[in-house]
């Protein structure tokens, strides 16, 4: 499975999360996953909440349309984005 998979109702992303980074950004490929750096620490779900907010902003969707399907407690996550309104350039190149 690749880092980005198109679905009928959106996209599935396989992510590798780097918490406590200096800034929020989509870094690029990390093996067969998309590396995302976020500023939040991995404490009490702060990193997951921050990740959902960041991804929702990047894809221009509501936070409720970003679903963590696997990896709630780890750095390796699989998320689903329902009907993204915009595709960030880092992700668009992986869809080609």
Curated annotation (Swiss-Prot):
GO terms for cellular component: cytoplasm. This is UPF0235 protein YE3436. It comes from Yersinia enterocolitica serotype O:8 / biotype 1B (strain NCTC 13174 / 8081). Signal peptide: none annotated. HAMAP family: UPF0235. Belongs to the UPF0235 family. The lineage of its organism: Bacteria, Pseudomonadati, Pseudomonadota, Gammaproteobacteria, Enterobacterales. InterPro entries: DUF167, YggU-like_sf.
């Amino acid at each position: 499975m690749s880092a980005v998979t198109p679905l009928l109702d959106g996209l599935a992303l396989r992510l590798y999360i780097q918490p406590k980074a200096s800034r929020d950004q989509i870094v690029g490929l990390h093996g067969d996953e998309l590396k995302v750096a976020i500023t939040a620490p991995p404490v009490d779900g702060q990193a997951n909440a921050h990740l959902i907010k960041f991804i929702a902003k990047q894809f221009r969707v509501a936070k409720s349309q970003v679903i963590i399907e696997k990896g709630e407690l780890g750095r390796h996550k699989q998320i689903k984005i329902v009907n993204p309104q915009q595709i960030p350039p880092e992700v668009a190149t992986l869809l080609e």
